[in-house]
């Protein structure tokens, strides 16, 4: 797996990587159930005994990339839970901040106890880059109200917000399967089709989301100016 950030689970590495083996229909089911518990249980069904992690230039905010942070290293381990606990520490999270890591430990998939970590370095060690503690993903998440959203839909929304629209938004944007059959003010994706202002698509692209939100803001400004 690539060591990288994730817009919903904060990190994705050894444990969540196994979700890629599932068919798309089952992936959507994971989101409907809430990602963390199914990911933890997946670790019981798919055993990993050697994990080689690509930490060359992953994006530490979003799983789809776009903002690579160059580390130029690989690391390997035998315990997927311990690997993910280490990744949490590297990205300034505690294992408790990523619920599926602790859940997997409680299920017996592995250990999240970093005191059990034994690191052996191979090859020359270059200048170590310090991973920033505060990253934009947290601020952008505050603008979104998500319930059982799929990673693709959520992942496209975050870059759209990043394009300068965030300060102009007054309402939270609703997204996710949990809004099916419900009403509201502002939503993106087909699951929010009952909302007063909605962008359909499963998922709509980041360009479509950007144009939709830009138009939404422009319409609101015009309405306010006419009052």
Over which residues does each language-model region extend?
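Extended, low-polarity segments enriched in aliphatic/aromatic residues
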Residues: 1-227
């Amino acid at each position: 797996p690539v060591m990288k950030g994730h817009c919903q689970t904060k990190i994705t590495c050894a444990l969540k990587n196994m979700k890629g083996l599932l068919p798309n229909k089952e992936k959507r089911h994971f989101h409907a159930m809430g990602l963390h518990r199914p990911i933890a249980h997946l670790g019981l069904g798919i055993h990993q005994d050697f994990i080689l992690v690509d930490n060359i230039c992953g994006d530490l905010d979003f799983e789809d990339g776009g903002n690579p942070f160059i580390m130029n290293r690989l690391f390997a381990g035998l315990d997927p839970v311990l690997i993910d606990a280490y990744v949490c520490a590297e990205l300034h999270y505690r294992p408790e901040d990523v619920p599926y890591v602790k859940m997997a430990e409680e299920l017996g998939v592995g250990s999240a106890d970093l005191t059990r970590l034994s690191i052996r370095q191979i090859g020359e060690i270059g200048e170590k880059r310090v991973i920033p503690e505060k990253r934009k993903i947290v601020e952008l998440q505050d603008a979104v109200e998500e319930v059982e959203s799929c990673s693709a839909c959520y992942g496209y929304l975050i870059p759209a917000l990043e394009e300068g629209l965030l300060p102009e938004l007054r309402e939270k944007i609703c997204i996710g399967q949990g809004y099916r059959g419900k009403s509201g003010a502002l939503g993106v994706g087909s699951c929010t089709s009952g909302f007063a202002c909605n962008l359909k698509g499963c998922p709509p692209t980041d360009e479509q989301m950007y144009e939709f939100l830009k138009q939404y803001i422009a319409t609101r400004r015009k309405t306010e100016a006419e009052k």
